[in-house]
């Protein structure tokens, strides 16, 4: 027999929803700080553009998760079916965008390590900006088409073929992102830690590797669930509710963890009392091995207004 609180709220549902709200609030603050610093206070480079867009996607996803969990706990229904559909579509857009940004970051980092000369000399200047714009537009189109064929038209007449096609395309796109992310991550690890030509590890490499590790541990299970849901939607009703709630909590942790990773890596071996948040984030995105000259430069930046 399930334990309930007054108002018939199941404890097994209440605790995960509260965890989502708590992790969401922490993640909102962290991603907002990252977005604010990268957007207005730090000079942008190829990777910081991706990090900025990833922070925006995580911020919007956590905000949507908090709203959905709060409405569920308060037993407040959505204003209308259209609002519910738009809300779910936006949540899906920012979620897929976040995965796409991670894949793009991993690929760019892999290219910069495997082909450093080509990357420095021949990479188009505005590649990051163009890629981020393409990712946002593509994610938006995929989710709008999926919602249109599987929600709007499906309620009016039999539209199973079109819905199935969009589900297969969406699942295939997510599988493609996972394959790219995993292969580029393995190549990056091999280049950094294996073979005769090992490269010196930078703080940025540590930041990216930790971010990818957290995603594989906390974000990947929900991605696999989404892929299965898109491919066998009509027959995928056997998943335990508690397991699904655990996946939601892990996804919230994944979106919340990135800013914590940035500030942890940036402050490692540094005295926190002598550092600002701007300096910590700048240090986490440092793409050159630490030398005495780098430390002197960081100290001089501290003295700047």
Curated annotation (Swiss-Prot):
Chain ranges on the Extracellular side, renumbered to this chain: 1-17, 75-78, 154-167, 229-244
Tissue specificity of this protein: Expressed in a subset of sensory neurons that includes nociceptors. Expressed in the subclass of non-peptidergic sensory neurons that are IB4(+) and VR1(-).
Side Cytoplasmic, residues: 39-53, 100-132, 189-207, 266-305
GO CC entries: plasma membrane
Residue stretches spanning the membrane: 18-38, 54-74, 79-99, 133-153, 168-188, 208-228, 245-265
SUPFAM superfamilies reported in the protein's UniProt record: Family A G protein-coupled receptor-like
Keywords from the UniProt entry: Cell membrane, G-protein coupled receptor, Membrane, Receptor, Transducer, Transmembrane, Transmembrane helix
Major place of residence: membrane
Gene3D superfamilies referenced in this protein's UniProt entry, alphabetically: Rhodopsin 7-helix transmembrane proteins
Cell location: Cell membrane
Protein topology in the membrane: Multi-pass membrane protein
One annotated GO molecular function: G protein-coupled receptor activity
Family: Belongs to the G-protein coupled receptor 1 family. Mas subfamily.
Protein role: Orphan receptor. May be a receptor for RFamide-family neuropeptides such as NPFF and NPAF, which are analgesic in vivo. May regulate nociceptor function and/or development, including the sensation or modulation of pain.
PANTHER family tied to this protein: MAS-RELATED G-PROTEIN COUPLED RECEPTOR (PTHR11334), MAS-RELATED GPR, MEMBER A2A-RELATED (PTHR11334:SF33)
Entry protein name: Mas-related G-protein coupled receptor member A2B
Organism expressing this protein natively: Mus musculus (Mouse)
Gene: Mrgpra2b
């Amino acid at each position: 027999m399930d334990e309930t609180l007054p108002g018939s709220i199941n404890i097994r549902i209440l605790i995960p929803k509260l965890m989502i709200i708590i992790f969401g609030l922490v993640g909102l603050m962290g991603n907002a700080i990252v977005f604010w610093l990268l957007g207005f206070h730090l000079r942008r480079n190829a990777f910081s553009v991706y990090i900025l867009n990833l922070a925006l996607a995580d911020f919007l996803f956590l905000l949507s998760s908090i709203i959905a969990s709060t409405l569920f706990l308060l037993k407040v229904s959505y204003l209308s079916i259209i609002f519910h559909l738009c809300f779910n579509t936006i949540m899906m857009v920012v979620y897929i965008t976040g995965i796409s940004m991670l894949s793009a970051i991993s690929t760019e980092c892999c290219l910069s390590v495997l082909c450093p000369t080509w990357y420095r000399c021949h990479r188009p200047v505005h590649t990051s900006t163009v890629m981020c714009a393409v990712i946002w537009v593509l994610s938006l189109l995929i989710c709008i088409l999926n919602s249109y064929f599987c929600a709007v038209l499906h309620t009016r007449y039999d539209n199973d073929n079109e819905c199935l096609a969009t589900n297969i395309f969406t699942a295939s796109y997510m599988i493609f992102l996972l394959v790219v992310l995993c292969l580029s991550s393995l190549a990056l690890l091999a280049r950094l830690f294996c073979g005769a030509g090992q490269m010196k590890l930078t703080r940025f490499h540590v930041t990216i590797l930790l971010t990818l590790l957290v995603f594989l541990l906390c974000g990947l299970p929900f991605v696999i669930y989404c892929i299965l849901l898109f491919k066998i939607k009509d027959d995928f009703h056997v998943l335990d509710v508690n397991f699904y709630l655990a996946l939601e909590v892990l996804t919230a942790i994944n979106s919340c963890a990135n800013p914590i990773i940035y500030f942890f890596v940036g402050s490692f071996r540094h005295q926190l009392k002598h550092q600002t948040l701007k300096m910590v984030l700048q240090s986490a995105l440092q793409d050159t091995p630490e030398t005495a000259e780098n430390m002197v430069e960081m100290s001089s930046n501290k003295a700047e207004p």
